[in-house]
């Protein structure tokens, strides 16, 4: 958790992050877990009230089905706050485009964009294929250079190894070095929020902090090299971001 309080000129933004919901078809369980119930537990939790923005940071669906995306679309359609979405490695962007309003967010088959909120800028990248394309990296470097204040970044894959023995070994980002080279140039980026690893982790990457948000589907034991489910209870993140101020907390339900 990073906290630095000072005389703040702008309001503190409350951002909710839900990651790796892995919604299946119909009401079928995914790996014997009621993933729809888990998603609703997070979405309807008291911690997600009075948000300024909700971020769904990839792996919305388990098998990229229209039915899964339609379920999520039905849940968020009456949201009183904007919802920003990016795909993960289990998602299919073409199917997502048929269900969600991603107008002006998809470029050459990748979903990446900037979202401005209360005078601050939040960036979203597409790492669904396990990489962040050079086009996205060039765009990110150019766009962040136009901004005087601090920015936030969301993407699905962590741009670093995290000490997660199972995920680092099998499913880490494929072009970490290239991504880190670009990120190191962006001095007004201090906080990066990701998912993918089904664990809560906080990693220091030079002058930036990478916050790995756990899953609403299930959690994976980070301490062994083979897959081992450590919990089927949903977890999600609340971010409070102000001027020279960042506070973030992961919430969880005790019952799956």
Swiss-Prot record:
It holds the Pfam family Metallophos. SUPFAM superfamilies: Metallo-dependent phosphatases (SSF56300). Its EC number is 3.1.4.-. Keywords: Hydrolase, Iron, Metal-binding, Nucleotide-binding. GO terms for molecular function: 3',5'-cyclic-AMP phosphodiesterase activity; metal ion binding; nucleotide binding. Fe cation 1 binds at residues 20, 22, 59, 198. AMP binds at residues 22, 59, 89-90, 198. InterPro entries: Calcineurin-like_PHP_ApaH (IPR004843), CNP_phosphodiesterase-III (IPR050884), Metallo-depent_PP-like (IPR029052). Binds 2 Fe(2+) ions per subunit. Its cofactor is Fe(2+). Fe cation 2 binds at residues 59, 89, 156, 196. PANTHER family: CYCLIC NUCLEOTIDE PHOSPHODIESTERASE CBUA0032-RELATED, PHOSPHOHYDROLASE. Belongs to the cyclic nucleotide phosphodiesterase class-III family. This is Probable cyclic nucleotide phosphodiesterase Fisuc_1441/FSU_1912.
């Amino acid at each position: 958790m990073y906290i630095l309080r000072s005389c703040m000129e702008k309001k503190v933004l409350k951002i909710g992050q839900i990651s790796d919901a892995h919604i299946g078809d119909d009401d079928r369980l995914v790996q014997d877990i009621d993933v729809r119930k888990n998603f609703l537990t997070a979405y309807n939790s008291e911690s997600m009230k009075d948000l300024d923005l909700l971020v769904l940071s990839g792996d919305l669906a388990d098998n990229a089905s229209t039915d899964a995306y339609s379920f999520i679309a039905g849940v968020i359609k009456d949201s009183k706050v904007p919802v920003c979405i990016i795909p993960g490695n289990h998602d299919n962007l073409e199917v997502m485009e048929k269900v969600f309003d991603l107008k002006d967010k998809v470029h050459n088959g990748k979903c990446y964009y900037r979202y401005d909120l209360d005078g601050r800028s939040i960036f979203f990248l597409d790492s669904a294929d396990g990489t962040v394309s050079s086009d996205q990296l060039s765009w990110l470097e150019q766009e962040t250079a136009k901004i005087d204040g601090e920015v936030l970044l969301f993407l699905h894959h962590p741009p670093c190894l995290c000490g997660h023995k199972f995920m680092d070994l099998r499913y880490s980002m494929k072009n970490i070095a290239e991504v880190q080279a670009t990120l190191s140039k962006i001095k007004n980026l201090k906080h990066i929020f990701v998912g993918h690893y089904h664990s809560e982790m906080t990693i220091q990457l030079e002058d930036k902090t990478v916050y790995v948000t756990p899953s609403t589907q299930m959690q994976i034991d980070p301490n062994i090299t083979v897959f081992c489910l450590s919990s089927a209870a949903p977890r999600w993140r609340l971010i409070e971001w102000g001027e020279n101020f960042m506070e973030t907390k992961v919430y969880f339900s005790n019952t799956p």
